[in-house]
Amino acid sequence: MKIGIIGAMEPEVAILREQISNMETLSIAGCEFYRGELAGHDVILTRSGIGKVAASIATTILLDRYAPDCVINTGSAGGFDPELRVGDVVISDEVRHHDVNVTAFGYEPGQLPQQPAAFISDSKLIEVATQVMHQLPELQSRIGLICTGDQFMCDPDHIEQVRQTFPAMMAAEMEAAAIAQVCHQFKVPFVVIRSLSDIAGTESPSTFEEYLEVAAKNSSAMIVAMLKQL
Protein backbone atom coordinates (compact mmCIF):
# COMPACT_ATOMS: atom_id res chain seq x y z
CA MET A 1 0.00 0.00 0.00
CA LYS A 2 1.25 3.48 -0.85
CA ILE A 3 0.65 5.90 2.03
CA GLY A 4 1.22 9.65 2.26
CA ILE A 5 1.98 11.09 5.69
CA ILE A 6 2.05 14.85 6.20
CA GLY A 7 3.48 16.83 9.12
CA ALA A 8 4.02 20.57 9.24
CA MET A 9 7.22 20.94 11.27
CA GLU A 10 10.54 19.13 11.59
CA PRO A 11 9.78 17.67 15.07
CA GLU A 12 6.49 16.30 13.73
CA VAL A 13 8.17 14.24 10.99
CA ALA A 14 11.62 13.49 12.45
CA ILE A 15 10.67 10.37 14.42
CA LEU A 16 8.94 8.79 11.44
CA ARG A 17 11.73 9.74 9.05
CA GLU A 18 14.28 7.94 11.23
CA GLN A 19 12.33 4.70 10.74
CA ILE A 20 12.12 4.86 6.93
CA SER A 21 14.45 2.52 5.04
CA ASN A 22 15.78 2.97 1.49
CA MET A 23 14.82 6.62 1.68
CA GLU A 24 14.90 9.08 -1.20
CA THR A 25 14.51 12.82 -0.56
CA LEU A 26 12.97 15.41 -2.85
CA SER A 27 12.49 19.16 -2.27
CA ILE A 28 9.78 21.02 -4.20
CA ALA A 29 8.46 24.54 -3.53
CA GLY A 30 9.71 24.57 0.04
CA CYS A 31 8.22 21.15 0.83
CA GLU A 32 10.29 18.08 1.71
CA PHE A 33 9.28 14.60 0.54
CA TYR A 34 10.90 11.48 2.04
CA ARG A 35 9.99 8.27 0.22
CA GLY A 36 10.91 4.79 1.38
CA GLU A 37 9.65 1.75 3.26
CA LEU A 38 8.03 1.89 6.69
CA ALA A 39 6.19 -1.00 8.36
CA GLY A 40 6.03 -2.84 5.05
CA HIS A 41 4.47 0.03 3.10
CA ASP A 42 5.64 2.42 0.41
CA VAL A 43 5.52 5.66 2.41
CA ILE A 44 5.91 9.26 1.30
CA LEU A 45 6.53 11.35 4.41
CA THR A 46 5.98 15.04 3.71
CA ARG A 47 7.10 18.09 5.67
CA SER A 48 4.69 20.76 4.48
CA GLY A 49 5.46 23.86 6.49
CA ILE A 50 3.02 25.62 8.79
CA GLY A 51 -0.46 26.86 7.89
CA LYS A 52 -3.22 26.13 5.42
CA VAL A 53 -1.57 27.46 2.27
CA ALA A 54 1.65 25.52 2.90
CA ALA A 55 -0.35 22.39 3.68
CA SER A 56 -2.43 22.78 0.51
CA ILE A 57 0.68 23.15 -1.65
CA ALA A 58 2.35 20.11 -0.11
CA THR A 59 -0.75 17.93 -0.30
CA THR A 60 -1.37 18.83 -3.94
CA ILE A 61 2.22 17.97 -4.89
CA LEU A 62 2.04 14.74 -2.87
CA LEU A 63 -1.18 13.56 -4.51
CA ASP A 64 -0.27 14.65 -8.03
CA ARG A 65 3.30 13.34 -8.05
CA TYR A 66 3.06 10.20 -5.90
CA ALA A 67 -0.66 9.22 -6.04
CA PRO A 68 -0.85 7.60 -2.58
CA ASP A 69 -3.76 5.31 -1.71
CA CYS A 70 -4.49 7.36 1.42
CA VAL A 71 -3.16 10.28 3.45
CA ILE A 72 -2.52 10.53 7.19
CA ASN A 73 -1.90 13.93 8.76
CA THR A 74 0.32 13.79 11.84
CA GLY A 75 1.54 16.31 14.38
CA SER A 76 0.49 18.42 17.33
CA ALA A 77 -2.69 20.29 18.24
CA GLY A 78 -4.25 22.39 20.97
CA GLY A 79 -6.89 20.70 23.09
CA PHE A 80 -10.45 22.04 23.29
CA ASP A 81 -12.28 19.20 25.03
CA PRO A 82 -12.04 19.73 28.83
CA GLU A 83 -11.47 16.00 29.37
CA LEU A 84 -8.31 15.99 27.25
CA ARG A 85 -4.78 16.44 28.58
CA VAL A 86 -1.41 17.26 27.03
CA GLY A 87 -0.09 14.17 25.26
CA ASP A 88 -3.53 12.72 24.50
CA VAL A 89 -4.23 11.74 20.89
CA VAL A 90 -7.22 12.96 18.86
CA ILE A 91 -8.29 11.02 15.77
CA SER A 92 -10.51 12.90 13.34
CA ASP A 93 -13.94 11.65 12.38
CA GLU A 94 -14.40 14.93 10.56
CA VAL A 95 -12.41 18.11 9.96
CA ARG A 96 -13.64 21.70 9.55
CA HIS A 97 -12.21 25.18 9.03
CA HIS A 98 -12.86 27.33 12.12
CA ASP A 99 -11.65 30.61 10.57
CA VAL A 100 -13.97 30.65 7.52
CA ASN A 101 -17.23 32.63 7.55
CA VAL A 102 -19.45 33.08 4.51
CA THR A 103 -22.67 32.54 6.45
CA ALA A 104 -24.07 35.71 4.84
CA PHE A 105 -24.62 33.58 1.73
CA GLY A 106 -26.30 30.69 3.53
CA TYR A 107 -23.28 28.50 4.25
CA GLU A 108 -22.53 26.89 7.59
CA PRO A 109 -19.80 28.37 9.81
CA GLY A 110 -16.49 27.06 8.49
CA GLN A 111 -17.91 26.10 5.11
CA LEU A 112 -16.40 27.40 1.88
CA PRO A 113 -18.54 27.79 -1.25
CA GLN A 114 -18.58 24.65 -3.40
CA GLN A 115 -17.20 22.62 -0.48
CA PRO A 116 -18.86 20.47 2.20
CA ALA A 117 -19.26 21.93 5.68
CA ALA A 118 -17.16 19.07 7.05
CA PHE A 119 -14.56 16.81 5.49
CA ILE A 120 -15.28 13.26 6.61
CA SER A 121 -12.39 11.00 7.54
CA ASP A 122 -12.14 7.58 5.92
CA SER A 123 -14.09 4.93 7.84
CA LYS A 124 -11.46 2.21 7.28
CA LEU A 125 -8.66 4.43 8.58
CA ILE A 126 -10.78 5.32 11.63
CA GLU A 127 -11.45 1.61 12.19
CA VAL A 128 -7.72 0.85 12.12
CA ALA A 129 -7.02 3.78 14.46
CA THR A 130 -9.67 2.43 16.84
CA GLN A 131 -7.96 -0.98 16.89
CA VAL A 132 -4.66 0.70 17.67
CA MET A 133 -6.27 2.68 20.50
CA HIS A 134 -6.88 -0.63 22.29
CA GLN A 135 -3.37 -1.90 21.53
CA LEU A 136 -1.73 1.23 22.97
CA PRO A 137 -3.60 1.81 26.25
CA GLU A 138 -0.76 4.02 27.48
CA LEU A 139 -1.89 6.59 24.90
CA GLN A 140 -5.17 8.23 25.86
CA SER A 141 -7.02 8.59 22.56
CA ARG A 142 -10.35 10.05 21.44
CA ILE A 143 -12.18 10.25 18.13
CA GLY A 144 -13.88 13.51 17.19
CA LEU A 145 -13.93 16.86 15.44
CA ILE A 146 -10.66 18.64 14.62
CA CYS A 147 -10.84 22.24 13.42
CA THR A 148 -8.27 24.26 11.49
CA GLY A 149 -7.36 27.92 11.23
CA ASP A 150 -4.34 30.08 10.48
CA GLN A 151 -4.24 31.11 14.13
CA PHE A 152 -2.51 29.87 17.27
CA MET A 153 -5.29 29.60 19.82
CA CYS A 154 -4.24 31.51 22.93
CA ASP A 155 -6.66 34.46 23.20
CA PRO A 156 -9.43 33.59 25.71
CA ASP A 157 -12.12 35.66 23.99
CA HIS A 158 -11.38 34.15 20.60
CA ILE A 159 -11.22 30.65 22.07
CA GLU A 160 -14.66 31.10 23.62
CA GLN A 161 -16.08 32.39 20.34
CA VAL A 162 -14.75 29.37 18.44
CA ARG A 163 -15.95 27.02 21.17
CA GLN A 164 -19.48 28.40 20.90
CA THR A 165 -19.46 28.06 17.11
CA PHE A 166 -18.03 24.51 17.15
CA PRO A 167 -19.10 22.99 20.50
CA ALA A 168 -18.10 19.45 19.47
CA MET A 169 -14.54 20.50 18.61
CA MET A 170 -11.88 18.45 20.39
CA ALA A 171 -8.71 20.00 19.01
CA ALA A 172 -7.47 22.95 16.97
CA GLU A 173 -4.46 23.15 14.67
CA MET A 174 -3.32 24.88 11.47
CA GLU A 175 -3.21 22.41 8.56
CA ALA A 176 -5.70 19.53 8.73
CA ALA A 177 -8.73 21.07 7.00
CA ALA A 178 -6.57 22.24 4.11
CA ILE A 179 -5.13 18.75 3.72
CA ALA A 180 -8.62 17.26 4.00
CA GLN A 181 -10.01 19.66 1.40
CA VAL A 182 -7.32 18.76 -1.13
CA CYS A 183 -7.87 15.05 -0.43
CA HIS A 184 -11.61 15.57 -0.90
CA GLN A 185 -11.07 17.18 -4.29
CA PHE A 186 -8.66 14.42 -5.37
CA LYS A 187 -11.01 11.76 -3.90
CA VAL A 188 -8.24 10.31 -1.72
CA PRO A 189 -9.11 8.86 1.73
CA PHE A 190 -7.60 10.64 4.73
CA VAL A 191 -7.49 10.73 8.50
CA VAL A 192 -5.89 13.15 10.97
CA ILE A 193 -3.90 11.88 13.97
CA ARG A 194 -2.87 14.68 16.32
CA SER A 195 -1.42 14.61 19.82
CA LEU A 196 -1.97 17.56 22.14
CA SER A 197 1.03 19.79 22.78
CA ASP A 198 -1.08 22.28 24.74
CA ILE A 199 -4.58 23.09 25.95
CA ALA A 200 -5.98 26.15 24.19
CA GLY A 201 -5.54 29.19 26.45
CA THR A 202 -3.17 31.90 27.62
CA GLU A 203 -0.50 29.34 28.62
CA SER A 204 -0.56 27.68 25.19
CA PRO A 205 2.65 29.21 23.74
CA SER A 206 4.90 28.10 26.61
CA THR A 207 3.19 24.71 26.92
CA PHE A 208 3.50 24.14 23.18
CA GLU A 209 7.26 24.72 23.25
CA GLU A 210 7.63 22.39 26.22
CA TYR A 211 5.50 19.49 25.00
CA LEU A 212 5.85 19.55 21.20
CA GLU A 213 8.27 16.62 21.26
CA VAL A 214 5.91 14.61 23.48
CA ALA A 215 3.07 15.26 21.05
CA ALA A 216 5.25 14.30 18.09
CA LYS A 217 6.32 11.08 19.81
CA ASN A 218 2.74 10.06 20.62
CA SER A 219 1.26 10.84 17.22
CA SER A 220 4.17 9.04 15.52
CA ALA A 221 3.66 5.96 17.72
CA MET A 222 -0.01 5.86 16.77
CA ILE A 223 0.78 6.13 13.07
CA VAL A 224 3.45 3.40 13.07
CA ALA A 225 1.02 1.09 14.87
CA MET A 226 -1.65 1.92 12.27
CA LEU A 227 0.72 1.16 9.40
CA LYS A 228 1.32 -2.29 10.85
CA GLN A 229 -2.44 -2.94 10.73
CA LEU A 230 -3.04 -1.65 7.20
UniProtKB/Swiss-Prot annotation:
The keyword Hydrolase applies. GO terms for biological process: L-methionine salvage from methylthioadenosine; L-methionine salvage from S-adenosylmethionine; nucleoside catabolic process. InterPro entries: MTA_SAH_Nsdase, Nucleoside_phosphorylase_d, Nucleoside_phosphorylase_sf. The keyword Protein transport does not apply. Gene3D superfamilies: Nucleoside phosphorylase domain. The active site is at E12 (proton acceptor), D198 (proton donor). It comes from the Bacteria. Pathway: Amino-acid biosynthesis; L-methionine biosynthesis via salvage pathway; S-methyl-5-thio-alpha-D-ribose 1-phosphate from S-methyl-5'-thioadenosine (hydrolase route): step 1/2. Substrate binds at G78, M153, M174, E175. It is an enzyme of class 3 (hydrolase). CDD domains: MTAN. It catalyses: S-adenosyl-L-homocysteine + H2O = S-(5-deoxy-D-ribos-5-yl)-L-homocysteine + adenine; S-methyl-5'-thioadenosine + H2O = 5-(methylsulfanyl)-D-ribose + adenine; 5'-deoxyadenosine + H2O = 5-deoxy-D-ribose + adenine. GO terms for molecular function: adenosylhomocysteine nucleosidase activity; methylthioadenosine nucleosidase activity. Its EC number is 3.2.2.9. GO terms for cellular component: cytosol. Keywords: Amino-acid biosynthesis, Hydrolase, Methionine biosynthesis. Catalyzes the irreversible cleavage of the glycosidic bond in both 5'-methylthioadenosine (MTA) and S-adenosylhomocysteine (SAH/AdoHcy) to adenine and the corresponding thioribose, 5'-methylthioribose and S-ribosylhomocysteine, respectively. Also cleaves 5'-deoxyadenosine, a toxic by-product of radical S-adenosylmethionine (SAM) enzymes, into 5-deoxyribose and adenine. Belongs to the PNP/UDP phosphorylase family. MtnN subfamily. PANTHER family: 5'-METHYLTHIOADENOSINE/S-ADENOSYLHOMOCYSTEINE NUCLEOSIDASE, 5'-METHYLTHIOADENOSINE_S-ADENOSYLHOMOCYSTEINE NUCLEOSIDASE. This is 5'-methylthioadenosine/S-adenosylhomocysteine nucleosidase. The gene is mtnN.
